[in-house]
Each structure stands twice: as C-alpha cells, then as structure tokens.
Amino acid sequence: MIALRLEGQAMEIEGTKFGSITIDRKTYEHDVVIRLSGEVIKRKKKLSKKYYGTSHVLSKDEAKFVFEKGCEQFIIGSGQMGNVHLSPEAETYFAKKGCKVLLQPTPDAIGVFNKSHAKKIGLFHVTC
C-alpha cells in the first residue's frame, strides 16, 4: 500500500520497534523508503540482496532506485542494532550526486529525519 501526502504537509515518524515503524499513525511491518514527496513505499531489498545475499548492504542498484533529483540528504535508518551499511559503489554514487548520506541506527535516524529541513529521502530498516 502506498500512502500519499499533501504538498507542504509535515510528516512525522512516531517511532519504531523491532519489525515495524509508525509514520503518521500508520504502522508498517516492513522496511520503508520515504520519497521526497513524502510518499511511503516498501523498500525493494531484492535490488541489494541479489548482489550481496543480504539486505544489510545497500547496492548501487538500490541507491539508483532510491535517489531522486533534488535530494540533499539521504537518511538511512540502519536497523535497530545498526546492521545496514552502504556498498562502496553506493557511497560513490551518492557522492557524485552531491547527496549527503546520514547513516544511524533506526531509532536515532528517526529523530534526524523528523528534525531535518533539507530535501530528504529516508530508508528505514526495521529489524536488526
């Protein structure tokens, strides 16, 4: 299911626990990506899993899927225990796009996302 947001409407990530994240009073029981528009979509983990056998390494293919022109910040919630990280190719991709990457455990990344006024995209891993 895709949640849409009205232009200029503030989004709030209320919290996370192992296996879920709550955004604007809706709980998602899977990893999510929050687009520049505020649209919440399911993360396409298979784009990374096909290369690394795990979704804990973000591939260049997944980076290309997630990135949108105009994005200033890519905030990654790396899981409850911080297991997700970028592949070297994904790091290079975001650097070439001029997009600052902030990677923190999901509970901390939520606070960063909520406080940021940048044009941002979020990816939140909800398990380990």
Each model region followed by its residue ranges:
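Flexible, charged surface loops at secondary-structure boundaries
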Residues: 28, 66-70, 115-118
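Short beta-strand segments
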Residues: 35, 77, 123-127
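Short acidic active-site motifs
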Residues: 61-62, 108-112
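A short glycine-rich beta-strand->turn/loop micro-motif centered on a GG-aromatic cluster
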Residues: 100-110
